[in-house]
Amino acid sequence: MKKQHIINETFLDAILAKKLGTTYTPPKEINDPDFDEAAKHFIDLLLRADGFKPVKTAVVHPIDKESLLGAVRAAQFNVIKPVLIGPQHKIESVAKVNNVDLEDYQVINVEHSHEAAKKAVELAKKREVAAIMKGSLHTDELMSAVVHKENGLRTERRISHAFLMAVATFPKPFIITDAAINIRPTLEDKRDIVQNAIDLMHMIKEDKQVRVAVLSAVETVTSAIPTTLDAAALSKMADRGQITSAIVDGPLAFDNAISLFAAEAKGISSSVSGNADILVVPDLESGNMLAKQLKYLGQAVMAGIVLGARVPIILTSRADPMDMRVISCVLASFIYNHTKAKLHIQAGK
């Protein structure tokens, strides 16, 4: 039987039943599903979050089925505690059609999506929520509120995005960054992008050694390909303590980063080759294409999160399946539960 690479709704039900101590019998056609290693990595991450305190999360403009059910599903796993922000009549209409009981969820009524984004950021600044989740609105609309100079959620770090991915042909989950926020990052931007990803990987990785591959088209440094210069500089910045808590090597071509055989065939000696935890892409275009190629051609399981703001931002798209939405919330839960003592966040109590 072909192995499953998607953590589908039925299996989410089975995991939830296990957490609640109840009995669950899946439909006959998928009885005892045989999941591949990619799905197992994310199932393990979901189960490891058991016992975490749920993250009080502002869900921005959840006026369609996917965004509302994604938040509700994550709440069923006790991963988040949603605060639904948007036109109340539209939220209630979607809930009614999809048999969702809103009694347990706070709903804040605002008229438009941009008001919902602004309200979510306001709640985060007041520490009344500890995460933000994108609903049925454009990413630019949400992020413009997040990065607003006076009223946004900026920190001393550059805001960046990370995809946590798993494929059956690679032995462990890995991060691709930045494939969604920074279009053509400078060297200084990339330093923050790398550090943001390192910090996240330390939160979710049980083996604390983190290895970072800075990607380019080739593994040699040449002025003809400027991204090789950035990669070499980032590697040296790690040597000098400007990037911390990881081994950073670059430039590395993609094959050298993920395959020790490919690296050895080219005479490359690197502790990162074949064992990378983080793949740092040259720019948004290359990263976005790489992530989507792995998803649609390599059957990758993936989740996404925005880092570097005052709170984690769960950034999903309309095409994302339910498992990606739930696991993206799990990433926010890991961040919150690893940092709440330091940040003294009041939300979630």
From Swiss-Prot:
Q: Where in the cell is it found?
A: Cytoplasm
Q: Which GO terms describe its biological process?
A: acetyl-CoA biosynthetic process
Any Pfam family matching the protein: PTA_PTB
Regions annotated as coiled coil: none
Give the CC-aspect GO terms. Answer: cytoplasm
**Which InterPro entries did the record assign?**
P_Ac_Bu_trans (IPR012147), Phos_Acetyltrans/Butyryltrans (IPR050500), PTA_PTB (IPR002505)
Which pathway does it operate in? Metabolic intermediate biosynthesis; acetyl-CoA biosynthesis; acetyl-CoA from acetate: step 2/2
UniProt keyword annotations, A-Z: Acyltransferase, Cytoplasm, Transferase
Catalytic reaction annotation: acetyl-CoA + phosphate = acetyl phosphate + CoA
Q: Which GO terms describe its molecular function?
A: phosphate acetyltransferase activity
Q: Which residues cross the membrane?
A: none
Q: Which family does it belong to?
A: Belongs to the phosphate acetyltransferase and butyryltransferase family.
The protein's name in its UniProt record = Phosphate acetyltransferase
Q: What gene is behind this protein?
A: pta
